[in-house]
């Protein structure tokens, strides 16, 4: 019985959590079927109730762990005390019992520790000596409820939108209102390039020139005679379209046929004017044969235009036929500065960009104006807070005088009235 009285256990009375009162939402969810589920609006309430249950369970667990530790330490301490008491008795020289000579050996080795013998305590009480602890009946700490940080995160995210406007933000708005240096670059229309038909014609001429030069090189290796007649420089490719245009402008010096007639013949007849004609002999200009027939084959006579009747009517007839067959459009290709689909779309998008830029600039001006007004209001609110502090100081002085049962001085009253009037004037400016 004495051991039970000395037991340090406190035997706490655990109070169970009333789920119906403390956790009504949790109880209602448990009573539902699986098909009903949980609504989103119930999650916050369920979280708080589950945290309450968790804190209660944690509190009980900590109390039980503390009781277990107290019981273990008390048992260890009890065994150490019995062991020390037995050692002290042997050191004092207690008379041994008759018929047990081994007791002397135990007395001789009392300083080193108890040896085996019949006077040895039971093995369950003989435990190695451990450090003694002093146990005090301190109140058990209540476990902290887990902190719900969601409101703090919410207000931290909202704070930048509700904070006061600074001068740096006003300067940022002013810099945004400055027109960018490259604004004009966005409204420039690039010049129209060369038409694909002209570009392809020039590429074809360049290809013909390369083929002719290659064929001329082969002919030079074989005969060595046709080389000078078929050589063509790369600069002649650019000169050929110009020469063709000059011939069309001056039909009296060139071909009398129109452009459509020439294009139709070029499409129907395959001709390589640059590649050498290997089978054609070189005419011999010396001799008697050049006397009579030389006039018809001389270079001077070759440059003279020959006359073909009805070239204009042929040109118009070919044009009408090509339009009727759908091979040619009735109108010519528009000029470079005329409207086309790409240019119309580009100008449309540029107009939208200008309208959007003007709208943004207007909104930025309004925002800058409102920001400056808000800055002035912030200064007035700061003055109101300072006036409130002055009014509270005057009020404390008057209340201290009344507590001391004395009448406030005229100076204190005047100061209080002055601060009140200043505060009212600032509030009028703030409301106006």
From Swiss-Prot:
It comes from the Eukaryota. Its main location: nucleus. GO terms for molecular function: transcription coactivator activity. The modification N6-acetyllysine is found at residue 418. The modification Phosphoserine is found at residues 280, 298. InterPro entries: Histone_AcTrfase_su3. Residues 295-305 have a biased composition (Polar residues). It is found in: Nucleus. The keyword Ubl conjugation applies. Functions as a component of the PCAF complex. The PCAF complex is capable of efficiently acetylating histones in a nucleosomal context. The PCAF complex could be considered as the human version of the yeast SAGA complex. Also known as a coactivator for p53/TP53-dependent transcriptional activation. Component of the ATAC complex, a complex with histone acetyltransferase activity on histones H3 and H4. Belongs to the NGG1 family. This is Transcriptional adapter 3. It comes from Pongo abelii. The gene is TADA3.
């Amino acid at each position: 019985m004495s051991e039970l009285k000395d037991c340090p256990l406190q035997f706490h009375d655990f109070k169970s959590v009333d789920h119906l009162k403390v956790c009504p939402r949790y109880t209602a969810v448990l009573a539902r079927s699986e098909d009903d589920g949980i609504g989103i609006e119930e999650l916050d309430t369920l979280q708080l109730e589950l945290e309450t249950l968790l804190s209660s369970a944690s509190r009980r667990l900590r109390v039980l762990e503390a009781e277990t530790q107290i019981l273990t330490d008390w048992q260890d301490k009890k065994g150490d005390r019995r062991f020390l008491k037995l050692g002290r008795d042997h050191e004092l020289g207690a008379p041994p019992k008759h018929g047990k000579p081994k007791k002397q050996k135990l007395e001789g080795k009392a300083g080193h520790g108890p040896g085996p013998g019949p006077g040895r305590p039971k093995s369950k009480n003989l435990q190695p000596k451990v450090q003694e602890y002093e146990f005090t009946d301190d109140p058990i700490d209540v476990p902290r409820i887990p902190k719900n940080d969601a409101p703090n995160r919410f207000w931290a995210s909202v704070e930048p939108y509700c904070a006061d406007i600074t001068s740096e933000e006003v300067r940022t708005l002013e810099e945004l209102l400055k027109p960018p240096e490259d604004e004009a670059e966005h409204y420039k229309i690039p010049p129209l390039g060369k038409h694909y038909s002209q570009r392809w014609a020039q590429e074809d001429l360049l290809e013909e020139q390369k083929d002719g030069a290659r064929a001329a090189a082969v002919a030079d290796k074989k005969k060595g005679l046709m080389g000078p007649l078929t050589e063509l420089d790369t600069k002649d490719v650019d000169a050929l379209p110009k020469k063709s245009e000059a011939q069309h402008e001056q039909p009296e010096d060139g071909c009398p046929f129109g452009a459509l007639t020439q294009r139709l013949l070029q499409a129907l007849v395959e001709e390589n004017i640059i590649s050498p004609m290997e089978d054609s002999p070189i005419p011999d200009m010396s001799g008697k044969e050049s006397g009579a027939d030389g006039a018809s084959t001389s270079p001077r006579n070759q440059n003279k235009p020959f006359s073909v009747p009805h070239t204009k009517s042929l040109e118009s007839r070919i044009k009408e036929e090509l339009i009727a067959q759908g091979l040619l459009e009735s109108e010519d290709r528009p000029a470079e500065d005329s409207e086309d689909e790409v240019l119309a779309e580009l100008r449309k998008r540029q107009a939208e960009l200008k309208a959007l830029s003007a709208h943004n600039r207007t909104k930025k001006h309004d925002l800058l104006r409102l920001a400056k007004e808000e800055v002035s209001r912030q200064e007035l609110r700061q003055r109101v807070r300072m006036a409130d502090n002055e009014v509270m100081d005057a009020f404390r002085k008057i209340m201290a005088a009344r507590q001391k049962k004395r009448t406030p001085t005229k100076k204190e009253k005047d100061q209080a009235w002055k601060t009140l009037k200043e505060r009212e004037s600032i509030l009028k400016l703030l409301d106006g």
